[in-house]
Amino acid sequence: MRSWLTVIGLAVAVWISIVAHTSEAARPAAPNLRALQGVNFIGSCTFSHMAMDDPIVYPGQPGVSHDHSFVGNTTTNAFSTLRTLRAGSTTCKRNGETAAYWMPTLLLNGQMVAPRSATIYYRRKTLAPLKAFPAGFKMIAGDRHATTPQGMQITYWNCGAASTVPASSAVPTCPNDRGQSLRLHVNFPSCWDGQRLDTADHVSHMAYAVRGACPADHPVAVPAISLIFRYAITGGSGVTLSSGGQYSAHADFFNAWRQGTLVSLVGRCLNALRHCGRDS
């Protein structure tokens, strides 16, 4: 009898070991910083319109702001709300991307130049899983008052990834080649305080992740947005921004996505550690 109990006990122990090993193998590996490289989904949008409006900084005050170039939602103006934006159409290719994005308008020798197109990367920068931006969320990245170079982790100019011209805080002179025309990049923070949809300064509810982690006072990881405007010009010293000089780059984001679409993309692309790109 005792030998049978011993055999049964050994069998149970082996079974528990197999189950534990199988469960461990089936569990997705915890991500590391290297695993986050290339995890994204991408928006492709064309230019919509220009206006001296800013529904985040100057809501309900048309004509008060410096001039902005808008992509995404086609109805964005000083009076925009979540409801009006949700009712609008979009210049973005993906159905449901009715969010509003804007930057200061580029000037070439004093003449306004519209962006040819915009690419919006939604990336994962944190080891912790992400939450989608809540509906109506607003934020600004970059400093519209800057008169000296901002950190290039926030904003920079370049001539495209394939160009040999290095990225810089000042406007470069790009080759006279459509594939290497001037670009302006602005990178948004990806850590939220988890409470406020906006703040008086439009920035303090957000923080940048450091080595894959959010700070304790901004504990909620959200997608890291990179907004890139492409211009059909080569750049050079004649380029300025409507907010002043070459260093005052900044960008605004107003979340008016169809929320179900955004939540789905965050879940099946960013939290699943997939490179969805534009085809998602």
Q: Each predicted region: which residue ranges?
A:
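Positively charged n-region of N-terminal signal peptides that target proteins for export
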Residues: 1-4
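Bacterial N-terminal signal peptides
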Residues: 9-17
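Signal peptide processing junction and immediate N-terminal pro/mature segment
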Residues: 19-26
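Primary mode marks residue(s) on the alpha4-beta5-alpha5 output face of response regulator receiver
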Residues: 27-65, 69-186, 193-280
